[in-house]
Amino acid sequence: MMQAAWQEISGGLTAPRGFQAAGITAGLKASGQPDLALIVSESDAIAAAVFTTSQVRAACVDFSRQQLDGNSIARAILCNSGQANAATGDQGWSDAVESAEQLAQALQIPSHQVLVASTGVIGQRIKMEALRTGIPQAIAALSPEGGPAAAQAILTTDLVAKQIALELPLGDRTVRIGGIAKGSGMIHPNMATMLSFITCDAAVSPQLWQEMLSRAVDRSFNQITVDGDTSTNDCVFALANGQSRTPAITERGPIADQLEAMLTAVCQHLAKAIARDGEGATCLIEVQVKGTADDAAARAIARTIAGSSLVKSAIFGRDPNWGRIAAAAGRAGVQFNSENLGVRLGEFELLRNGQPLPFDRNAASQYLRDRAAGAYLQDDTVLIQVDVGAGTGQGVAWGCDLSYDYVRINAEYTT
């Protein structure tokens, strides 16, 4: 990624100009926690999206994909939290359609300009009575400062809300990108429930905006794993409404590259926040791989290591077991010469040219304990570096350790 010319600003999702958001309690969750999020652009916005590749998809996924088929404009995103509306048959589809139509009518916009998302328990339909009464309440709560409330309303088993906003100078004006995300379990996206909604006030051509988002997702959300399970509801929506009044970006070039780099930075921040918030996790794991023939191969190895249950368990046990890292690298489906393999854990070099090195095991274990006790998303990252040869490919993936609490949380999820 190019050198950052942007800076982080407050406001999250609604930091970009021309966006409002709300997060309310509509009664969809039995807990009484916020459960309905609404994001609205004051003007037509170019919409891009990436969806789950699961063959079992929620109604909201197929419906929103259909909404964007041949249409690149969206004005609103509605997300309910509590029921996934997946594996709910024809009635689930009808509920998704009605959700969009109800919102469009209330906002007085075309229904094809509404995208919908759901998260919660698979097999449960949306509580439509609560949704019908919640939509006007959410509209009434819309605010240019509503980003944090929307970030809270999309959560399920998450422990913390996930949001960010960045600002980039372009000439005598600035462009902003904001985003929110949710995800804690069932996280192994390929585009958990993993949802992310991104706003931008740049003017970008539809094809270029979609290409930017797809590449950003490949380098962020598609590089995280908590438990290896891909959700039925995964989606990323990105709206760009042009309200920054900067010149339209219609083709690749230095300005487009800067915007894409900032979009990728937003996605990577949110992706890492999801991985760190993995159910029962005590630390974030970052796996850096280099030396492959290309970047895709490096990303594949990194993701395999980050997703290895044995690696994750070793990190939770504060065990610097490099053998598990090497084994995971070897089964990633990427060819390399094991005699070139090198592994580092933090500052400790464990393996060089395929041969183990002496290291202070107690100090390495203490490094893992210190990361588990570190400040959230600051000093809590376990760094694993893997070198497989002389190639120029590089890749990064993120995950978390696997604790007893992960099993407890998921064993008791619906009981």
From Swiss-Prot:
Assigned keywords, A-Z: Acyltransferase, Amino-acid biosynthesis, Arginine biosynthesis, Autocatalytic cleavage, Cytoplasm, Multifunctional enzyme, Transferase
Please give the pathway this protein is involved in: Amino-acid biosynthesis; L-arginine biosynthesis; L-ornithine and N-acetyl-L-glutamate from L-glutamate and N(2)-acetyl-L-ornithine (cyclic): step 1/1; Amino-acid biosynthesis; L-arginine biosynthesis; N(2)-acetyl-L-ornithine from L-glutamate: step 1/4
Instruction: Please provide, in alphabetical order, the Gene Ontology terms of the cellular component aspect for this entry.
Output: cytoplasm
Q: Where is this protein found?
A: Cytoplasm
Residues at the catalytic site? 193 (nucleophile)
Family that this chain belongs to: Belongs to the ArgJ family.
Job description of the protein: Catalyzes two activities which are involved in the cyclic version of arginine biosynthesis: the synthesis of N-acetylglutamate from glutamate and acetyl-CoA as the acetyl donor, and of ornithine by transacetylation between N(2)-acetylornithine and glutamate.
The cross-references to HAMAP family, in alphabetical order and at most eight, read: ArgJ
Report what the protein is called.
Answer: Arginine biosynthesis bifunctional protein ArgJ
- This protein's species is Synechococcus sp. (strain ATCC 27144 / PCC 6301 / SAUG 1402/1)
